[in-house]
């Protein structure tokens, strides 16, 4: 049971974004893909739930190949994969309760009482009690982010995908979100795939780091190991030296 990317290729026009991208996300762990803005991180994350289709290669969730799925089978896979969007992506005209309840209502499996219970449980998990009736605009950026996590876990997914969970937040809120990512692993047992260019946050939450460079994974390993990796691309990224990064091939 895991998420696997096998030899993905993706281009937008002349822009080759993924070029032989392969990675396995082991069960129960937090795997983080790091790389600069524009390197293709969101693109690979979106292939997992069918928001972007690769030009070639395969994406697997457990035993299901998802890159070619459509309709109900794709929807079934999406239920097992919670997605925390970069800017929380809450619906502004809906209360926090309705935002978190949306996916649950769509399945039609729970009655309103059970949905209410699940929404409150999910908000408790992210330390957001008592905001059910508020609108997204009434919450701080960090609270909106947490509400986005609550919505992603409401269906009790097996996997959680986080797109830049800490980008644009103040340092204290970054720590809150980092702890939340760890808590989702520890309390819900979810397998997590995080993408970020925030290295400090990546060091804190990851069981495994994977560095994306020129459309493919350049290096995978334990966070403690990355500083000693003898590769100009890796060193260029972690030390913020664009010349090393760009010249590495
Ligand atoms: N839907 C799209 N249409 C055209 N170009 C896109 C689209 N999505 C992403 N791109 C381009 O693909 C590259 C990688 O984007 P993205 O995956 O969002 O990078 P990252 O998340 O690492 O910042 C960028 O050059 C971006 O402009
Ligand atoms: Mg992105």
Region locations from a protein language model:
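A short, proline-enriched helix->beta-strand linker immediately N-terminal to the Walker B motif
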Residues: 154-158
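Catalytic Walker B motif of ABC-type/P-loop ATPase nucleotide-binding domains
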Residues: 160-163
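Conserved ABC ATPase "signature" region
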Residues: 64-65, 112-130
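Helix-to-loop junction immediately C-terminal to a conserved catalytic motif
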Residues: 49
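ABC ATPase NBD coupling module
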Residues: 66-82, 106, 112-113, 226-229
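Conserved ABC ATPase signature
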Residues: 135-139, 143
């Amino acid at each position: 049971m895991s998420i696997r990317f096998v030899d993905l290729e993706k281009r937008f026009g002349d822009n080759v974004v993924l070029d032989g991208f392969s990675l396995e996300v082991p069960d129960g762990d937090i795997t983080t893909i790091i790389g600069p803005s524009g390197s293709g991180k969101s693109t690979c994350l979106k292939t997992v739930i069918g928001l972007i289709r690769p030009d070639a290669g395969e994406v697997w969730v457990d035993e299901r190949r998802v890159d070619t799925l459509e309709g109900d089978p794709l929807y079934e896979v999406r239920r097992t994969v919670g997605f925390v969007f970069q800017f929380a992506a809450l619906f502004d005209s809906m209360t926090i309760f309705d935002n978190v309840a949306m996916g649950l209502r769509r399945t039609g499996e729970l009655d309103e009482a059970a949905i209410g219970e699940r929404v409150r449980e999910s908000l408790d998990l992210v330390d957001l009690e008592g905001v059910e009736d508020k609108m997204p605009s009434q919450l701080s950026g960090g609270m909106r982010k947490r509400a986005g996590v609550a919505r992603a876990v409401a269906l009790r997914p097996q996997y959680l995908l986080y797109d830049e969970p800490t980008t644009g937040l103040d340092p204290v809120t970054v720590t809150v979100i980092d702890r939340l990512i760890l808590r989702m692993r520890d309390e819900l047992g979810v397998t997590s795939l995080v993408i970020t260019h925030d290295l400090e946050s990546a060091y804190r939450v990851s069981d495994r780091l994977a560095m994306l460079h020129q459309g493919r994974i350049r290096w995978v390993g334990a966070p403690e190991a990355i500083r000693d990796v003898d590769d100009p691309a890796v060193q260029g990224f972690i030390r913020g030296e664009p010349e090393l990064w760009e010249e590495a091939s």
